[in-house]
Amino acid sequence: HDALPISGLLDFLIFKVDNRVEDVNLYGDIYIKKIIAGLLKKFLIGCQNMMRECIELEGSGFPVPARYEDIKNMVRGYLGFGNKMGEGWLLTGEMLELIHSGVSNIVCTQPFGCLPNHIVGKGMIRAIRENNPSANIVAIDYDPGTSPVNQENRLKLMLSTVKRVLREDSPAGSVAGNEESSSLLIHDNVI
């Protein structure tokens, strides 16, 4: 069983540091912030590169995560880099990274009524689907007041779409009841 790509904490840390650089670029903040944030970003990207090299060399079966700058470039045309509420543009970038790496079925969970992630996450799903017709993305809220039945129904609806697509793409009868081959990935966003 191949491991599926899941973004790590390091991308989020680089994103937070990079936001300080973008603040200076977009809003004209204190220039020393840009220098310090730039140095920290360079250090974190160096750590990411070492991690990528180790994963490649070890042959562990884990996919090598995309570079932060590659994820950032995927977002161009979707969102501006000044959009940093919640996970900001990174959430959209993570979904695009999954799609580009072959994962077309994504469950985007939104815990605790996080309004920024609702806006950015759910708001970008339509644009992502328009540019990536094979994308099957569902956003599910996990709040104390959210009905588990609604959550389960959204997952069942998504799985029915997966089954339909697999039937259309496969020889007759070869997909019956085989949800495991659908490359479903549950993606958990926690802020």
PLM features: what roles do these ranges have?
Residues 1-4:
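Short, small-residue-biased leader/transition segments that mark boundaries at the very start
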Residues 8-23, 145-150:
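Short, conserved secondary-structure transition motifs
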Residues 12, 49-53, 89, 143, ...:
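Aromatic-residue detector
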Residues 15-18, 34, 115:
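Generic signature of intrinsically disordered, low-complexity segments enriched in small/polar residues
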Residues 21-33, 128-130:
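Short, structured secondary-structure boundary patches
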Residues 28-60, 163-191:
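Extended, charge-rich low-complexity interaction segments
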Residues 36-92:
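Active-site rim loops that border cofactor/substrate pockets in soluble metabolic enzymes
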Residues 68-168:
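Hydrophobic alpha/beta core scaffold segments
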